[in-house]
From Swiss-Prot:
Record's keyword terms, sorted: Digestion, Disulfide bond, Hydrolase, Protease, Secreted, Serine protease, Signal, Zymogen
Active site: 82, 127, 222
Any GO CC annotation of this UniProt entry: extracellular region
Keyword RNA-binding in record: no
Taxonomic lineage: Eukaryota, Metazoa, Ecdysozoa, Arthropoda, Hexapoda
Protein function: Constitutive trypsin that is expressed 2 days after emergence, coinciding with host seeking behavior of the female.
Domain Peptidase S1: 42-266
Family the entry assigns: Belongs to the peptidase S1 family.
Name the UniProt record assigns to this protein: Trypsin-7
Encoding gene per record: TRYP7
Transmembrane segments annotated in the record for this chain: none
Disulfide-bond pairs as recorded: 67-83, 192-207, 218-242
Catalyzed reactions per annotation: Preferential cleavage: Arg-|-Xaa, Lys-|-Xaa
Length: 267
């Protein structure tokens, strides 16, 4: 009997370890009462005003916060392809100029979705989608485009960044109403590949976070901005859980598709 119990415990430990290692996309919360929880913000971060990140938008599916996004110019927003995969443009809007995803600011309809032609839903490679807006934006101190890197512009490991959004905080005590941000350093590409697997982390991906965890993007932040020195270097994409030790957040690297963004949007 004791041998059977020992075998069962060994199998259980292996299953749990395997589950923790499986990367999960920062899938949006389609319904406000998702079984994943009702929180909507960055883990381990701090509240900010949208004027601190005026390029930030809330991408909304049938009037509910789904993902983040970044203003590129008066007609285009960049988000993650896994946020728009399988959806029609008429079901989407963006809210801009508000620190709250559910009120205030300006709401604009999405006219067209352009996902990257190489987007792979199975490994989340090329996780980029451009959204053409129905009407032009009016810029102000709370609505501004973000600067973009040049094609293939490198980002040094250890570069401090800011990631923002309304994704899950994993905390029952924090309000889900206000925009949050966290400062996280970029991680060496090889270190990130060792954390996950060499096949999981492609050249279109960029990692950021602390070895000890504690600060990260999470569900509901997908598609949102990772900015360094005023430039949009990443799009919130996926990770193993949220803010887990040893597993940095994974972002879609913007510099790799700079020419594609320019070709589609003119930016």
């Amino acid at each position: 009997m004791s041998n059977k119990i020992a075998i069962l415990l060994t199998v259980l430990i292996a299953v749990v370890a395997c589950a923790r290692a499986q990367p999960s996309r920062r899938h949006p919360l389609v319904q406000p009462r998702s079984p994943h929880g009702s929180g909507h913000r960055i883990v381990g971060g701090f509240e900010i005003n949208v004027s601190d990140t005026p390029y930030q938008v809330s991408l909304q599916y049938i009037n509910s916060h789904r993902c983040g996004g970044s203003v590129l110019n008066s007609k285009w927003v960049l988000t993650a392809a896994h946020c728009t995969d399988g959806l029609q443009a008429f079901t989407l809007t963006v809210r801009l100029g508000s620190s709250r995803h559910a009120s205030s600011g300006t709401v604009v309809n999405v006219a067209r979705i352009v996902e990257h032609p190489k987007y792979n839903e199975y490994n989340t490679d090329y996780d980029y989608a451009l959204l053409e807006l129905e009407s032009e934006l009016t810029f102000s101190d709370v609505v501004q485009p973000v600067a973009l890197p040049e094609q293939d512009e490198a980002v040094d490991a250890g570069t401090m960044t800011i990631v923002s959004g309304w994704g899950s905080t994993k905390s029952a005590t924090e309000s889900n109403a206000i925009l949050r941000a966290a400062n996280v350093p970029t991680v060496d590409q090889e270190e990130c590949r060792e954390a996950y697997s060499h096949d999981a982390i492609t050249d279109r991906m960029l990692c950021a976070g602390y070895q000890q965890g504690g600060k990260d993007a999470c569900q509901g932040d997908s598609g949102g901005p990772l900015v360094a020195d005023g430039k949009l270097i990443g799009v919130v994409s996926w990770g193993s859980g949220c803010a887990q030790p040893g597993y940095p957040g994974v972002y879609a690297r913007v510099a790799v598709v700079r020419n594609w963004v320019r070709e589609i949007s003119g930016v």
